[in-house]
Amino acid sequence: MTTNEAIKERASYRGKYLEEAVSRDNLEIIMEAGLAAPSGCNRQTTSIVAVDDSALLEQIRPLLKRVGMTAPALIFVLSEKIASYHGNCYSVQDYSAAIENMLLTITDLGYASCWVEGYMTDFKDGVGKQIAEILKIDPKFELVCCLPVGKPDEEIKRVAKKPFEERAWFNLGN
């Protein structure tokens, strides 16, 4: 699959997963893709934890809100707030680039996933903090995202994107 094909094929999958394990080799390929993403001033503020241990998965799954509850592997994205250009922090852009790299690699390897962030970082639910405690993550990191990974058990439904002409232009204003 080419990069462009992976971009067009990628879709958010919120269904059930087959019980088929994701190999450690493939998890490492996915994680390496995330770590290869660009970062502001090369601060490399993004770190990644993959969970494929059944005992840990059983502790974490009750905290997930349906999406990824049956995935054989979960990838958690961690962010460290480090100042870079003119003292600004670009960790959100850094981890977003890492997540997209991983989503494209997940698609390329024939797996499905979904970018799960909202309730991970929502202070009301505190799910990210609870998972970070289970995984004994250093407090200097914020757990910002979960990517369930596995073979889909259902058809992946792709949502139509708005037409190019509604969202992209050449030489706008000229």
Spans of model-derived segments:
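Acidic, surface-exposed loops and disordered segments
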Residues: M1-N174
